[in-house]
């Protein structure tokens, strides 16, 4: 049996409850439609503002979903780095992108060995917080092996369809920093 809901009234004085409720609706309603001619947008209409914290959370999660949904001819090391640069808050975060020459210099030889099987150059992204007055020791590391950045011939055929997700660790890291 299907139900149709035209309006929802929420009686709460707690903004957090409202934010969590709307957050659930917006996450459920995510549709990646970049390549659809007739994209379906959300049918929900709201007459309130989501807090900045939850709006930022939703935007970060949707960015993560977009990154892992894109096909491998769209997301590869260089395009991943460019898309990341366009999304981060440049006032709060420094982003340094290391190319193959720099990767060799700092000795990331395993990355270079895997990358020999690819026609695309490797990229390593390094983030740091700008103007931080606190000395906080937090490190996020996310593996971002994009499909066709090497190693395809050493993967068993049974795992090939999941190779696209090998970059999800880096996508999560970027989304946290975003």
Q: Predicted regions: what is each one?
A:
Residues 1-137, 141-144:
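Short amphipathic alpha-helical segment within the helicase RecA-like ATPase core
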């Amino acid at each position: 049996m299907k139900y149709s809901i035209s309006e929802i009234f929420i009686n709460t004085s707690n903004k957090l409850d409202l934010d969590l409720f709307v957050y659930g609706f917006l996450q459920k309603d995510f549709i990646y439609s970049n390549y659809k001619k007739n994209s379906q947008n959300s049918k929900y209409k709201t007459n309130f503002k989501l807090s900045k914290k939850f709006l930022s959370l939703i935007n970060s999660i949707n960015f993560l979903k977009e990154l892992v949904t894109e096909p491998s001819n769209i997301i590869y090391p260089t395009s991943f780095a460019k898309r990341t640069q366009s999304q981060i808050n440049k006032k709060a975060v420094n982003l340094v992108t290391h190319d193959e020459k720099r990767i060799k210099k700092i000795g990331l030889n395993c990355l270079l060995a895997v990358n020999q099987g690819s026609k695309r150059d490797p990229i390593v992204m390094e983030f740091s917080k700008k103007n931080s007055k606190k000395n906080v020791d937090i490190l996020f590391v996310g593996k971002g092996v994009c499909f066709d950045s090497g190693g395809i011939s050493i993967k068993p055929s049974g795992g090939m369809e999941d190779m696209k997700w090998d970059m999800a660790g880096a996508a999560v890291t970027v989304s946290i920093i975003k």
